[in-house]
């Protein structure tokens, strides 16, 4: 179940206040649980899977540092994005104009489909409604 809340924001152009939905920060699902779940379905020991994931991470980092995008089959792909300061002309641009590199993950088609609002397995609940339901069972 995914929880969301409504945030009030003022539109800087029209100065009208509007409400927008935001996902409530999710509780992290630890790697150890993912490894345990995968190992239940495969003939592999948890330490072997953790070792493979460790080296997978190293290879992804190395490939990104070498300028490649990295595709992980039906999971998706990673690539780097560069952030810089805007300058009026090419001549004004220097290495100091560069701000940061950001790692981007783009899910593959199947993952996008599985995590879309049209999928019946994706359940969204407004946080305040979820809390009201939880409180009803505790009333005396």
Model region roles, listed by residue range:
Residues 1-51, 55-140:
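Strongly charged
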């Amino acid at each position: 179940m995914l929880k969301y809340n409504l945030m009030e924001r003022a539109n800087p152009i029209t100065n009208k206040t509007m409400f927008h939905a935001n996902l409530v920060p999710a509780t992290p699902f630890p790697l150890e649980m993912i490894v345990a779940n995968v190992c239940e379905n495969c003939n592999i020991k948890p330490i072997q899977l953790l070792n493979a994931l460790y080296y997978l991470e190293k290879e992804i980092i190395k490939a990104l540092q070498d300028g490649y995008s990295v595709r992980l089959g039906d999971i998706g792909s990673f690539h780097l994005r560069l952030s810089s300061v805007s300058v009026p002309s090419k001549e004004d641009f220097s290495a100091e104009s560069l701000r940061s590199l950001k790692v981007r993950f783009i899910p593959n088609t199947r993952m996008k489909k599985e995590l879309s609002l049209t999928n019946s397995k994706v359940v969204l609940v407004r946080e305040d409604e979820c809390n009201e339901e939880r409180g009803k069972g505790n009333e005396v």
